[in-house]
Amino acid sequence: MAQEAPRWLEPSPFEWKDQTGLAVKTAIPGAKPTVAIDVASVTKSYGDKPVINGLSFTVAAGECFGLLGPNGAGKSTITRMILGMTTPGTGEITVLGVPVPSRARLARMRIGVVPQFDNLDLEFTVRENLLVFGRYFRMSTREIEAVIPSLLEFARLENKADARVSDLSGGMKRRLTLARALINDPQLLILDEPTTGLDPHARHLIWERLRSLLARGKTILLTTHIMEEAERLCDRLCVLEAGHKIAEGRPHMLIDEKIGCQVIEIYGGDPHELSALVSPHARHIEVSGETVFCYASDPEQVRVQLDGRAGVRFLQRPPNLEDVFLRLTGRELKD
């Protein structure tokens, strides 16, 4: 007999509003137009410093939506407003069908959060961390214990249930933080830099786990500085700079729209001389330190100019989301 899927892995019911304005629930993502997050013309200032400027975007139920931007772009501020922890100056935010911040407590009961830095109880065991966290959602001990085995299996921590968190590796702690965020069977997951600082093996395991959640109908709001992560996971994304939305769309569409040609990275010589050498055959050129980024529709012509030059090395590759990000926000360091 097939084992029944754990409750927290089943597609969650989503709310939508019909023409009468009444809230209606559907357990089938996509059966009706659904919106998990609606941010409409939101502003926020601290003193006389604006940090969010008329920002609008929607996150459809069941999709992974990315928020990208350099430090200080407003990602943390808008995330805090979505959670009801910060009040917008103007504009409206609706999360899972309820207005925020006025009914943020209700919305948060259906949200799981993975913060940028793990805030686990280090002296507790893995199991104890899950037990304690579940009580914040008014779950009984019996309810929590019923889902712990599935959560540990999901996080691949079945053999670490009684281990102290302080003895876990960084990747294990991150997986436990993700499992903990699922304790309340959330409809929406908010992930802040979920794989920063992890080695490639741990990062890819987290990505695989997140894709399995999306396949189950969960909604994910993701902030990250890892462009490969955003390109792999996000259905759509929004790029912020100084509180403004400067681009929005599907990753591959943004790559085609903003770049749309091969990229050749050139280094090992004077960047200004190299730029002048290849510029007749380039659609666009950027210089960062000692590296020249040449965007070319006909890379063969660029290679002809570079072949045989002493000390000069180059790498031709397809464009990626990092190229888009740096094209939009610039290659200068932003603190």
Curated annotation (Swiss-Prot):
GO terms for cellular component: plasma membrane. It is found in: Cell inner membrane. Residues 37-267 form the ABC transporter domain. PROSITE patterns: ABC_TRANSPORTER_1 (PS00211), ABC_TRANSPORTER_2 (PS50893), NODI (PS51240). It is a peripheral membrane protein. Its main location: membrane. Gene3D superfamilies: P-loop containing nucleotide triphosphate hydrolases. ATP binds at G69, P70, N71, G72, A73, G74, K75, S76. Pfam families: ABC_tran (PF00005). Keywords: ATP-binding, Cell inner membrane, Cell membrane, Membrane, Nodulation, Nucleotide-binding, Plasmid, Translocase, Transport. Its EC number is 7.6.2.-. InterPro entries: AAA+_ATPase, ABC_transporter-like_ATP-bd, ABC_transporter-like_CS, ABC_transporter_ATP-binding, ABC_transptNodI, P-loop_NTPase. One of its GO terms (molecular function) is ATP binding. Belongs to the ABC transporter superfamily. Lipooligosaccharide exporter (TC 3.A.1.102) family. Part of the ABC transporter complex NodIJ involved in the export of the nodulation factors (Nod factors), the bacterial signal molecules that induce symbiosis and subsequent nodulation induction. Nod factors are LCO (lipo-chitin oligosaccharide), a modified beta-1,4-linked N-acetylglucosamine oligosaccharide. This subunit is responsible for energy coupling to the transport system. The complex is composed of two ATP-binding proteins (NodI) and two transmembrane proteins (NodJ). This is Nod factor export ATP-binding protein I. The lineage of its organism: Bacteria, Pseudomonadati, Pseudomonadota, Alphaproteobacteria, Hyphomicrobiales.
